[in-house]
Amino acid sequence: MKKDTKNLYKEKIVPSLMEEYGYKNVQLVPKLLKISINRGLGEEARSSKEMDANLKELAVIAGQQPTVNKARKSIAGFKIRDGMPVGASVTLRQDRMYAFLERLIHITLPRVRDFRGISAEGFDGRGNYNLGIKDQLIFPEISYDDVNQLQGFDISIVTSANTDEEAYSLLKKFGMPLQARA
């Protein structure tokens, strides 16, 4: 599975982007650097049982053990103390990144009800794409019976592209169902 996406990039996407943007060197062609998956835990961080369930869900979705993000300073208004767990994140690179991207594009996103493509507004101006997932049940790895509470997370796709247009073209060639840019 991961080899297919990686080979697609090397054999079809790189030559296509070189022709489209007039790159003289293969190293100039934009590529995927990493995919970060981040989830804020909120109230679930107080209960170790729910925290473990959240970490397990992220591990199943990403195929890699997440790291726990802890608060850097205390904020009384949010009832957060320094060092308390506030979120979890996973950074995928290389083969796991390509495997996750392929599952996201071909299996997960088509499972969304009334799906018409993802917004092209998620680019940050530097060639990276951010996507918010509202609930974890769109992933086939997650069983409905195991979920205590619907909770979303953020996916950041980091590329080496310099502009949003290059990143849009790169992701579109991977098969990402992006809506047309305005």
Curated annotation (Swiss-Prot):
Transmembrane segments: none annotated. It comes from the Eukaryota. One of its GO terms (cellular component) is chloroplast. InterPro entries: Ribosomal_uL5, Ribosomal_uL5_bac-type, Ribosomal_uL5_C, Ribosomal_uL5_dom_sf, Ribosomal_uL5_N. GO terms for biological process: translation. The keyword rRNA-binding applies. One of its GO terms (molecular function) is structural constituent of ribosome. Keywords: Chloroplast, Plastid, Ribonucleoprotein, Ribosomal protein, RNA-binding, rRNA-binding. It is found in: Plastid, Chloroplast. Part of the 50S ribosomal subunit; contacts the 5S rRNA. HAMAP family: Ribosomal_uL5_B (MF_01333_B). NCBIfam families: PRK00010.1. Binds 5S rRNA, forms part of the central protuberance of the 50S subunit. Belongs to the universal ribosomal protein uL5 family. This is Large ribosomal subunit protein uL5c. It comes from Emiliania huxleyi. The gene is rpl5.
